[in-house]
């Protein structure tokens, strides 16, 4: 039988319940959730975690995931694929465990609209689903008009590979087929964007591949920013492993790209006009399309939420987790999305049961490979301060600058272990 003690126990086992989640935080009037329905739009790191943990906290809630893809290829780890360290199968996960072990409904359709007054979601096959609470985890979309000459169509020639799948495989193919001694050029995105260290891990993994297969190739990055996550660690690793192979230029160098000639594989910036054999354009980003359609975004193009529960500030009863939400200092990453998913699940279940949501602390961990046996990491811990998630002073940190190659190898091993652990927790257990 469900009661507040069982809820607290389940949340503690999941690592969500904090010291604030004592009995004093809970209402004595626990409502029955029998027959309550939660619909989750999106089956990635955030959405799948929310769905699983709602069922884990309260198995009586009916949970449905709406996800058009029957398998999910992760962005975390996709840079490793470019270096030939893992294959597509390693990065691809299905929904069978969520269905069979957790009794979650998974419908492989696209959500086309939401009627907030009637609390229904309409799918592209015309099916209409009722909900008591809605969770939206749609990931990102791109601002295709941010650079003159670049478009969704152009990405079939100059891939972004910032949504894992065919784009990842296209970029890998281009890297493998690049002429000996050729040039790889990355156009990095402006803030905010998915996975802060991701572009620089990608440069590293392309260099790792070239070092083995195309040692006279060169790599250049034009970046509209002047600094990036783990910058000194990346640059130190680049010098140590690749010498002068990787050149990075920032905004202060005039490296903001203003125009791209797709046909001639040429990019224009104040810094220079550059032609390359392979060009990886990672565009400016915004919340996933369905978030705009539902009306969950503000003028920033992202979704404002109450950062202690991840409930939308614009529409009560609708929650947003993952890359699309505005989560204060918490970065946009797969780890963040999954942690947010667990806290959001707790918020949904406490709300449905008439309990108070405890104060939360969240965490983000990000491992990056600079080489196949050279890893670095960053950890952040966050808590709401005046309604905004801010870093906890003295908590977290980054890999030390002066480390032995054996220590870097250990961190590389930790990166693979992290990936296996988080994907198992979400999709395979």
Feature-to-residue mapping (PLM):
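A Rossmann-like FAD-binding core segment of flavoenzymes
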Residues: 101, 105-113, 121, 129, ...
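A conserved FAD-binding loop/helix module that cradles the flavin
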Residues: 325-360
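FAD-site-proximal beta/loop scaffold in flavoenzymes
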Residues: 153-180, 274-339
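Active-site-proximal substrate-binding core of FAD-dependent oxidoreductases
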Residues: 349-387
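Glycine-rich dinucleotide-binding loop and its adjacent helix/turn
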Residues: 138-212
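N-terminal export signals
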Residues: 6-27
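C-terminal auxiliary extensions adjacent to catalytic cores
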Residues: 379-429
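Beta1-alpha1 glycine-rich phosphate/pyrophosphate-binding loop at the start
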Residues: 28-105, 190-231
């Amino acid at each position: 039988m469900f009661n507040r003690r069982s809820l607290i126990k389940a949340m503690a086992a999941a690592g969500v319940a904090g010291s604030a989640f004592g009995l004093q935080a809970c209402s004595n009037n626990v409502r029955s959730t029998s027959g309550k329905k939660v619909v989750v739009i999106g089956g990635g790191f955030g959405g799948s975690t929310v769905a699983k943990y709602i069922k884990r906290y309260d198995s009586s809630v009916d949970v449905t995931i709406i996800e058009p893809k029957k398998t999910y290829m992760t962005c975390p780890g996709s840079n490793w694929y470019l270096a030939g360290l893992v294959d597509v199968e390693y990065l691809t996960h299905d929904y069978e465990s969520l269905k069979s072990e957790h009794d979650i409904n998974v419908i492989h359709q696209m959500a086309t609209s939401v009627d907030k007054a009637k609390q229904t979601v309409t799918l592209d096959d015309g099916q209409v689903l009722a909900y008591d609470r809605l969770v939206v985890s749609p990931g990102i979309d791109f601002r295709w008009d941010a650079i003159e000459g670049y478009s969704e169509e152009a990405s079939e020639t100059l891939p972004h590979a910032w949504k894992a799948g065919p784009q990842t495989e296209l970029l890998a193919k281009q890297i493998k087929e690049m002429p000996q001694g050729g040039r790889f050029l990355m156009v990095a995105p402006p803030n905010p964007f998915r996975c802060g260290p991701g572009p620089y891990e990608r440069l590293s993994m392309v260099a790792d591949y070239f070092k083995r297969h195309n040692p006279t190739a060169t790599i250049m990055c034009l970046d509209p920013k002047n600094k990036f996550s783990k910058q000194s660690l990346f640059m130190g690793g680049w010098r140590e492993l690749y010498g002068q192979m990787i050149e990075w230029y920032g905004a202060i160098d005039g490296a903001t790209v203003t125009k791209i000639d797709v046909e001639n594989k040429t990019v224009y910036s104040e810094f220079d006009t550059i032609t390359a054999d392979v060009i990886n354009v990672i565009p400016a980003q915004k919340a996933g399309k369905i978030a705009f359609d539902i009306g969950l975004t503000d003028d920033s193009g992202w979704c404002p939420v109450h950062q202690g529960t991840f409930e939308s500030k614009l529409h009560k009863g609708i929650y947003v987790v993952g890359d699309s939400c505005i989560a204060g200092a918490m970065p946009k990453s797969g780890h963040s999305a999954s942690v947010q998913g667990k806290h959001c699940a707790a918020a949904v279940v406490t709300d449905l049961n008439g309990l108070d949501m405890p104060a939360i602390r969240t965490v983000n961990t990000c491992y990056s490979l600079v080489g196949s046996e050279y890893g670095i990491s960053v950890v952040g811990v966050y808590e709401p301060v005046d309604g905004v998630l801010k870093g906890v002073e003295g908590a977290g940190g980054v890999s030390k600058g002066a480390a032995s190659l054996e220590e870097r190898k250990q961190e590389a091993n930790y990166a693979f272990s992290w990936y296996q652990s988080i994907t198992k927790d979400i999709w395979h257990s």
